[in-house]
Amino acid sequence: MDRLEVFQNELALIAEPEIRELTEFALKSAEAKFFVAPASSSGKYHTVDSRTVGTMEGLNNIIVPGGLVHHTKDVVKLAHEGIPKLFCADDLMIAEKSAIICASILHDITKYGIPCRIHTIAEHGELAARWLEKIAEDKLSALGEHWSTVPNIIIEGIALHMGRWAPSKNKPTLETTGLIHEADYWASRKFIKIER
């Protein structure tokens, strides 16, 4: 599996091509550790399968996903199927739904820092948002020309996905980014099992 194949099902949920392109670009640009690292470096948080370590094998770097990928898939599933229904947010525009899936896929993309470290870093949400703004400034600007709220949903959704548990303690200000925060919270609970 390559980087995009790992998230093939999740990328298919992004109905807007420009938002899917941004997400794919970010996945291709991410540190390799994102694809093979456990979701929790301490083992204190997340489900058992989210604490696994994956590998990159062979000359073609075939990916056997780690726990962070499993956690990310769980967040996407909750953000797409569960959390919007719980909060009566089924009336979102297609672009907003696509932005939520994009942010859900990318929310932990720099969880181990840039360059990667041994342990996760507390401010990884803010770091991921700044990283995406830096590497994809032109793509985010183009999205803003079509949909004024989409770049904010993506950037705030990534930056504030931890809410009060982040060092900044800043909570999401938009309903849409609150959905990402809720999905991440519930996906990280040890007692929750999400079918993939």
Kindly label every feature range from the protein language model.
Residues 55-64, 70-71, 82-196:
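Divalent metal-dependent catalytic cores for phosphoryl transfer on phosphate-bearing substrates
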Residues 1-116:
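Acidic/His-rich, divalent-metal-binding segments that scaffold phosphate/diphosphate chemistry
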